[in-house]
Structure formats: C-alpha cells, structure tokens
Curated annotation (Swiss-Prot):
Class of this enzyme: ligase
Subunit structure: Tetramer of two alpha and two beta subunits.
Domain of life: Eukaryota
Residues engaged in binding L-phenylalanine: T308, Q350, V351, E352, Y390, F416
UniProt cross-references to NCBIfam families, sorted A to Z: pheS, PRK04172.1
Protein family according to the UniProt entry: Belongs to the class-II aminoacyl-tRNA synthetase family. Phe-tRNA synthetase alpha subunit type 2 subfamily.
Catalytic activity of the protein: tRNA(Phe) + L-phenylalanine + ATP = L-phenylalanyl-tRNA(Phe) + AMP + diphosphate + H(+)
CDD domains: PheRS_alpha_core (cd00496)
EC numbers, comma separated: 6.1.1.20
Cofactor(s) recorded in Swiss-Prot or TrEMBL: Mg(2+)
Pfam family, one: PheRS_DBD3
Record protein name field: Probable phenylalanine--tRNA ligase alpha subunit
Gene3D superfamilies found in the cross-reference section: 1.10.10.2320, 1.10.10.2330, 3.30.1370.240, Bira Bifunctional Protein, Domain 2
Amino acid sequence: MSLSQKILELLKNTETIKSTDIDVRSNELYPVLLSLASKEIISFTFKEQIIYKLTEEGESILKNGSYEFNLYNSIGDNGMELLEVDKYNLGKVNAFKNKWIKKVGDKVYKSADNVEDNVKNMLNNVTNKIYQKEEISLLKKRKLIYQAKEVVYFIKKGPLYGKDSDNITELISKMVISGEYKHLNFKPYNFNTKGNIQSQGALHPLMKVREEIRKIFLEMGFNEMTTNKFVESSFWNFDTLFQPQNHPSRDAHDTFFMKTPSTTSYIPIDYMKMIKKIHSVGDFDSDGHFSDWDIKEAEKNILRSHTTACSTRTMLEIAKGEFISAKLFSIDRVFRNEALDATHLAEFNQVEGLIVAKGLTLGNLMGYLKRFFEKLGITDIKFKPAYNPYTEPSMEVFGYHKGLKKWIEVGNSGMFRPEVLRPMGFDKDVRAIGFGLSLERPTMIKYGISNIRDLIGPKVDIEFIKKSEMCFFN
C-alpha cells in the first residue's frame, strides 16, 4: 500500500488524523500531502511542537538499564569489595544517593529490597511522549535526553475525497466537440503558486563602465579602432613606438613572451627599414638611440602590453592616403608581468584615445582629458610630468579615490614624438596626441572599491556583480 493510499484508508472512519498516526518521516509525508491537497482530496494544517529525544547514552540505558541499577544487581549476599565497586563509578554515586547500597567495612552491601530502575522507566516515558516536568529536568541534567522540534500535520477530508481523483490537467479539442469535458474533473489553477526563480546572467561592473565610456567617446566624436590582436610582435608593441631594444620594459620582468609561435615574419619591409634607421642612426632631425637594431628582437611575439600597438597600425594606414584628421579610441585587454597588489593586476583593460591632426598642442590634450573625466564624473584630477619613450611631453593622470583617501594613477598621456610619426609618412606639421587609461581604476572609483581583487578574480562576490547598480556618468 502506497503512502497516499494509507492516508486515505485512515481517513475512512474519521474526519481528521494526525501525522503521528502514520509511521513515516515528515520529509517523506509532506510532498504526498501537497499532491493530495492540490487535487482537493484532503486538506491539512501543521503545528510545531517541542519533543524530547534520547541521547546515545540514553538509548544505551533504555536497552541495558541504568548504571546504579546494574550495580545494585551485581552485589551478592556477601557484598562487593570496594575496589570492584569503583569500577561502577557512574552508578556508585546515584546508588548511594538512592540508599540502595551501604558501606560496611571494606565492602558494599544492598540496603534496599526490590528496587525499581526509575531512570529506565523515565526514558521509556520519553519515548512514548509522556513528559513529566520533574523527570524531564532530571534526564536533561544527566544529559540522557535533548530537546527537538517536531512538525505534526492535521489531515482532513477534502471536497473531492472518495471521488475520482484523476484530475485532468489538459483540455483538448476532442473533449470540447464531444462534450466530454462537462463530466470531467479538471485540476483547478493555483494562482498562489510561486514559480521557480530563474537564474540569469548579470553584466559585470567593468562591462557597465566600459559601455558608458564607449558612449562618452562616441559623443565626443571618436571612432572605434580594431584591437582584436592580443598577441603582437615586439616590432609593433615597442619598435614602432621608438622604444629602444635595450629598454627595461622589454625584459621578461615586464613582458609576457610567447613560447609558440615565438616569432613572426609579418613585418612590412619598407616601414621596417625606416624604423631601423630612426633607431640606429636617426632621421628627421633625430639622433636615434646610437645603438644597433636587431630584426630578431623585433620579431619576438608577446602578449601586448598596451593597445598603442594597434594605434600605430591605424596611424600607418592613415598616413598612406591623403591626410584626414582622425579621432579614434579603443577599449581592450592588455597584459603586463607586474606584481599583484590592491591596485595592480597582470592583465587589465586599457582605454585608449588617439587624435591625429595638424597643429595640436599639449593644451588640446589636457582639455580632452578634463572633458573626458568630467563626463566620467571624476572631477578631481591632476597631471604630473612623466617620461614615455614614444611621447614628449608626457603626463600621468591621477584621480582622487575617496575610499582609499589618496590619489591613484588612472592613466598616461602625451604627444607622439616625431620619431614615431615621421617614419609612417606624416608631414612635419601633423601631430598626434594619445592617452591610455585603465578601465579598472575608474570602475573602482565609481563603485567605491578599494581592492582590485574584489572586482576581478576568483574571490569576487557573485552577489556584488548581480546587485551592482547600473552605471551612468553625468
């Protein structure tokens, strides 16, 4: 007999039964009750009540008797030696307390006749749910029972009890045409049932800020560059930007070098010759680096350390045709072999802006940066003179982080050197200004995050991502 049949059978001769009348666990009973109630065969309510259960020691005493009772039964007519009594340490104290035994000389003798194992009887009452206040207090004190909660279900007959319980869940055209539906029991709609909460994706705060920054660039008249090359050659990442081949940043401590393929052969020959000349002997009023330039060093593949490598590719294409000024931007991933701390990661997203036009000045660059950061909502910014191999003059950009209560670097900027622009074929009066900004730092400022590892990495709280506010910059 199934559990549902057992419940219906018990209800035959009474209006109400309790779950205690059914020998089954609560977690097994509940889904069966829900199923029967949904068909209106039964209805049920429940109530929580306090019960007491036996501990492991209590179960042992219920089975084998209490320690004091067992000691009493072990003492013969000739008594028991004290050393032997000591073996019954757990029962000795209570046996003396109950005056079941007495000490005479070096032996212990019975001092009562026909004693009853009260502790075992109390435990038996507990198993039968007969609770006496004094007994419960004593058993709890001896840690033979513990308190627990029990759910008791009160089950009654429903409107459809005793009727055909096979409720129809689907109405089909055949039932309507034949009129059969008039004689069928349809399962009623339950409008109070809550549907399952569907899991859903959530945009990471970085992606929210990225999209807003992209909108800002587009509002300022910039066009997006193609930056789908995570792997670059040292030629585009360093050499085209007039970075010496013996520069410290090209060392393995700052750069991730590719193992396979370790080198590239796709370098424009004519442009490569111009780059070699500007590095080794100089040109266009520049003295170069006064050092040899090795093509093998330029062919080494790396994970790009900045998206400026994509900027040089784009500027080279602009220089090939009739000159037209351009405002370009990109937001993409870059990689640097740096020590990890609260504000640095080995891979991060770089926001890059590039303007190529005639007659540009450092004032133009500062104006664009101030306007850009104002749109981001970061009004507290300042500039600091800096050095970059490919820009002169150069500036670091700092924003004030209210959480860390200090200024943190949010980007770098500068005017591209003639040694970068002239080998591409640009005229002398063509200037280019560029700025590279971290996407993570403005995001940290926007969302009040002080440790970048709370934003990216294995320790990020998924609830933070789900509940992070939409990003709007005023």
